[in-house]
A protein has these predicted regions:
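Membrane-proximal envelope and lipid/glycan-remodeling enzymes
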Residues: 1-537
Length: 537
């Protein structure tokens, strides 16, 4: 995150540097000050999520694009720099899938401005080799066209109304419209006062026309980064935002603030303007900067979402840092041990230690205990066919995979109901009115049916329908479902890899119904007869 802010300011400083040659100016942080003043920006800087990588990437791309937009008249473009920029732009889709909009636009600009076909080939190869190679690997190894997390979040469909709620939730506590409104006249004044040195104006040539020169220019790069921010914001509004306060709008905000990351306050010298005009310009810029600085001081100390910060309301949005600080009792939960104070976490270790023969752990209504489903063990000590009995296995079915994974060790399988680490849940349909980011929910009956667990009473909890378990077990025999699961569960061989590549589009689109009976009907399988509910005491 810090590297991203440094690169942001270096890029913006480079943007204004040519017009400051021979002039005295004071460089002041403006957009950078706005970004670091927003509390979610500071929270997610150390969250362990991809936020830091995103800022570093966007800052690097911004700085390199600014350098690319300022070719010297007397010096030809470096092919090494051109290839490096194309490589960085191509990596956009590897940082986050939706960043393909940013990296793709940068590559298009470079192709338009390229003077020769040799350079265009270089741009295509440097920008496309790694993303294409990794895409082939993803298709062959995972059998998917997109990351599994993108499948779980399911970009299909739109939730514009929820997205507007998310924007309002991010804007309201900090009045973010204030610095954005102040940044517009600030940027316009800086553009008006900007000197256009002749050494940055490449001569028109047959292979470098007006369109190419217009694309490879500072105004075009400013339009590129601002337009990218707008596109990213619209993308996330369409998606419905997120359940974490402010998280997915931080990257769009970063892009929108890039052209005014730092601003030069020119000292009047009477060269380009009269001293009186220069003083008016300095006064206007200083006034706008003071407004931004004042807002930043206020926003940095804002209470944020207030009383609703840790309560899951109808919007489904919470302040994640405060939520976990409150739930664990630690102001800054950092280590695995800190999260043992989260509800159910200490109890999971007790449950694992008390089940040496193996078990599936299901979250109960009591935060101090887990419901247990025993592992099926052959009574003779050997499996059918004379094979040795399988080793005891443990699995935990819960939403919060991170804190579980840190504390239960590598021998315990952690699976979730929303599909982030569970391929079966990831291929369910998105629930229309569910909490954003958690809008897939696999019933525990499927997990019991899919593993070596007891599937009858009294081995399963009373709230589990044994008939559903039986139906889910039958539904898992659907040929299409088995093919999808085998794509990630079967041993990886060359044949499996090539088969996954060929069927990745089909597997990515495949969805099952989370109600076992409906899934049997969808697949055209017979609905098995199952026992009724457990006897009441």
């Amino acid at each position: 995150s810090l590297l991203g802010m440094v690169l942001l300011m270096l890029g913006t400083g480079r943007l204004y540097a040519p017009s400051l040659r021979g002039r005295r100016a004071i460089m002041l942080p403006a957009g950078a000050l706005v970004y670091i003043a927003v509390p979610p920006a500071r929270d997610f800087a150390t969250s362990g999520l991809e936020s830091g990588l995103v800022l570093a990437y966007l800052g690097l791309l911004w700085w390199m694009m600014v350098c690319w937009s300022q070719p010297l008249r007397a010096r030809p473009d470096s092919q090494m720099f051109l290839g490096a920029l194309a490589f960085v732009a191509g990596c956009s889709v590897l940082v986050r899938p939706e960043f393909a909009l940013i990296g793709g636009l940068a590559l298009i600009m470079m192709l338009i401005a390229a003077r020769t076909w040799r350079r265009r080939v270089l741009i295509v190869l440097a920008g496309g080799f790694l993303p294409v190679a990794y895409q082939i690997f993803r298709m062959g190894y995972y059998g998917l066209l997109v990351p599994s997390t993108a499948l779980a979040k399911d970009a299909a469909g739109d939730k514009w109304s929820q997205g507007m709620i998310y924007v309002s939730n991010f804007n309201r506590p900090y009045a973010l419209w204030v610095p954005l409104v102040l940044s517009v006249p600030l940027g316009l004044l800086l553009m008006t006062a900007r000197r256009r040195p002749s050494f940055l104006r490449p001569v028109l040539a047959p292979d470098y026309g007006r369109v190419a020169r217009a694309v490879q220019s500072p105004p075009a790069v400013v339009a590129f980064i601002v337009g990218s921010g707008v596109l990213q914001a619209l993308y996330w509004i369409r998606q419905g935002g997120d359940f974490m306060h402010g998280r997915v709008l931080l990257a769009p905000l970063f892009c929108l603030l890039a052209p005014v990351g730092v601003i030069p306050i020119l000292l009047p010298d009477g060269k380009d303007f009269s001293r009186e005009t220069g003083r008016w310009l300095v006064g206007a810029l200083s006034g706008l900067w003071l407004g931004i600085a004042g807002w930043s001081l206020w926003a940095a100390n804002s209470p944020g979402m207030g009383d609703d910060a840790t309560r899951v309301t109808y919007s489904g949005i919470v302040d994640e840092r405060r939520f976990y600080a409150q739930a664990t009792g630690h102001a800054h939960p950092l280590t695995a041990a800190d999260y043992l104070d989260y509800p159910r976490m200490a109890a999971v270790l007790t449950a694992l230690n008390n089940t040496p023969e193996g078990a599936l752990l299901l979250p109960s209504g009591n935060y101090n205990q887990w419901d247990l489903v025993p592992m099926i063990r052959p009574s003779s000590g050997t499996a059918p066919g004379g094979k040795p009995a399988p080793k005891p296995q443990h699995a935990v079915f819960f939403t919060n995979m991170g804190m579980l994974g840190m504390n239960v060790g590598l021998d315990v399988r952690v699976i979730d109901q929303i599909g982030l680490v569970n391929p079966l849940a990831a291929h369910t349909e998105r629930l229309k009115h569910a909490r954003i980011g958690h809008d897939k929910n696999l019933f525990p009956d499927w997990v019991i049916a899919d593993g070596p667990w007891v599937k009858w009473y009294p081995g399963i909890p009373g709230y589990i329908d044994q008939q559903w378990v039986t139906q889910a077990e039958a539904a898992l025999q659907c040929p299409a479902t088995r093919a999808v699961l085998n794509s990630v569960r079967a041993p990886i061989t060359l044949h499996r890899f090539l088969s996954n590549v060929l069927h990745s589009y089909e597997f990515t689109r495949y969805r099952i119904d989370r109600v076992p009976r409906y899934e049997l009907v969808r697949c055209g399988l017979d609905v098995p007869d199952g026992p009724g509910p457990p006897p009441r005491e």
